[in-house]
From Swiss-Prot:
Gene name tied to this protein: WASF1
Biased amino acid composition, Basic and acidic residues: 182-202
Protein name in the entry: Actin-binding protein WASF1
Domain of life: Eukaryota
Example GO molecular function: actin binding
Length: 559
């Protein structure tokens, strides 16, 4: 049904019924036709005025927009051509705080609304019959709907279309969200490396070159296959004759004994010693080779020292502790694997620092012994880390006052080397008391009085009171007799300026969030009957990678 905007009356000039009693009918028809022509001319003039008036209004609005655009272009041209780079007209803060430009042009939407109804259509609408007065029943409805909308609702089709568009947009957003969640929950599968293709023709060409050249090429090919496909054997899928041919010429069993031993030696040198494994146990001697191992307690540390007779040095100091020693440190960088293997085969137990000088030199050159040096690693020797220092057997006191009586109560008696070797192994010493218990019996002190020869100088060369046998405890471990009471600090209270600043920052953040929320709500209100916005929103959701790219996303504010 076409919608007539302008209707010219009358349509027919001469189609009129003549009244009765007219004698001159021709003159009457002429007058009626002339009057209808005048009426039509008046209608045409009226509609012409409407048409040209609309054209004038459109031209006026167009000229106004062009003039405003020209003024803006002139201002920009002046700013661009006459801009002084030395003078900063706008600060960086003003530029960042300025909002993005938004056009204020109102797009033509809802063309068939009551507000956009033209005057000729309004006149035609006024001629029509009015609907029944159903709005009178609206206050009596419980659902709040207008009563007239059940009879006539101009926005029915638009509301139906809008609801369908918004529902489709929401469904697509939910589908994308589910797909994204599914991708996050799915574990990341490692990429599978394809197996290298097998070139049989190349292998036969290498075999045709001769057994000498084929041997090196086959070794190189085997290395490449192991690098590409891992240690899994690739030759199992080949014919059995080719495997036999390869194994027969240069297999390990076909090598002479000298080459085989050399390969095994190289393989042993490639073995890395793990730093966290304990050292190998000493070899077990036979019943006839068993030698007594003297045991002593060091006067400096109170630790038990077993000194087995080594064939190389005569004695090898080894620390023995009631508790298992900590794991050994890693190998130094300067230590080679060959020297390590040689030292492990020659010296079974892992020794510590080099042995002290023999007793003869100690008797001939009496001197004050230096303080115990830190443990050093001999070249080619692995040893466990030194055990922790045992707690002192006497009550803690200043180190200078403690050194003299300790030196006096520990006499040193040198023993000949033959007696040391002929003595039977002494019984195991009693365990050391815990740190918190003070020893009540002098058993441990008497055990300290007979160390083996060669460990300490003679009584004539004993160190004086100024040389402490035990390392002095650090000052941090000295417990003061009386601790001063701690009083509450009398520092000035921090000013409230910092808290006020933090409160202002929190309020600013909260205000910013409220402003963003209001802007978002204003966008949602703008969607109400905006056809272009609804369509653009749907297109944005369809073609975006994520649901967050949409300009209007109410999920962040509604959830």
């Amino acid at each position: 049904m076409p919608l007539v905007k302008r209707n010219i009356d009358p349509r027919h000039l001469c189609h009129t019924a003549l009244p009765r009693g007219i004698k001159n009918e021709l003159e009457c028809v002429t007058n009626i036709s002339l009057a209808n022509i005048i009426r039509q001319l008046s209608s045409l003039s009226k509609y012409a005025e409407d048409i040209f008036g609309e054209l004038f209004n459109e031209a006026h609005s167009f000229s106004f927009r062009v003039n405003s655009l020209q003024e803006r272009v002139d201002r920009l041209s002046v700013s661009v051509t006459q801009l002084d780079p030395k003078e900063e007209e706008l600060s960086l803060q003003d530029i960042t705080m300025r909002k993005a430009f938004r056009s204020s042009t109102i797009q033509d939407q809802q063309l068939f609304d009551r507000k956009t109804l033209p005057i000729p259509l309004q006149e035609t609408y006024d001629v029509c019959e009015q609907p029944p007065p159903l709005n009178i029943l609206t206050p009596y409805r419980d659902d709040g709907k207008e009563g007239l909308k059940f009879y006539t609702n101009p926005s029915y089709f638009f509301d139906l279309w809008k609801e369908k568009m918004l529902q489709d947009t929401e469904d697509k957003r939910k589908e994308k969200r589910k797909q994204k969640q599914k991708n996050l929950d799915r574990p990341h599968e490692p990429e599978k490396v394809p197996r290298a293709p097998h070139d049989r023709r190349r292998e036969w060409q290498k075999l045709a070159q001769g057994p000498e050249l084929a041997e090196d090429d086959a070794n190189l090919l085997h290395k490449h296959i192991e690098v590409a496909n891992g240690p899994a054997s690739h030759f199992e899928t080949r014919p059995q004759t080719y495997v036999d041919h390869m194994d027969g010429s240069y297999s390990l069993s076909a090598l002479p004994f000298s080459q085989m031993s050399e390969l095994l030696t190289r393989a042993e040198e490639r073995v890395l010693v793990r730093p966290h494994e304990p050292p190998p146990p000493p070899p077990m001697h036979g019943a006839g080779d068993a030698k007594p191992i003297p045991t002593c307690i060091s006067s400096a540390t109170g630790l038990i020292e077993n000194r087995p007779q080594s064939p190389a040095t005569g004695r090898t100091p080894v620390f023995v502790s009631p508790t298992p020693p900590p794991p050994p440190p890693p190998l130094p960088s300067a230590l080679s694997t060959s020297s390590l293997r040689a030292s492990m085969t020659s010296t079974p137990p892992p020794p510590v620092p080099p042995p002290p000088p023999p007793p003869a030199t100690a008797l001939q050159a009496p001197a004050v012994p230096p303080p115990p040096a830190p443990l050093q690693i001999a070249p080619g020797v692995l040893h466990p880390a030194p055990p922790p220092i045992a707690p002192p057997l006497v009550q803690p006191s200043p180190p200078v006052a403690r050194a003299a009586p300790v030196c006096e109560t520990v006499p040193v008696h040198p023993l000949p080397q033959g007696e040391v070797q002929g003595l039977p192994p002494p019984p195991p010493p009693p365990p050391l008391p815990p740190p918190g218990i003070r020893p009540s019996s002098p058993v441990t002190v008497t055990a300290l009085a007979h160390p083996p020869s060669g460990l300490h100088p003679t009584p004539s060369t004993a160190p004086g009171p100024h040389v402490p046998l035990m390392p002095p405890s650090p000052p941090s471990q000295v417990i003061p007799a009386s601790e001063p009471k701690r009083h509450p600090s009398t520092l000035p209270v921090i000013s409230d300026a910092r808290s006020v600043l933090l409160e202002a920052i929190r309020k600013g953040i909260q205000l910013r969030k409220v402003e963003e929320q209001r802007e978002q709500e204003a966008k949602h209100e703008r969607i109400e009957n905006d056809v272009a916005t609804i369509l653009s929103r749907r297109i944005a959701v369809e073609y975006s990678d994520s649901e967050d790219d949409s300009e209007f996303d109410e999920v962040d504010w509604l959830e």
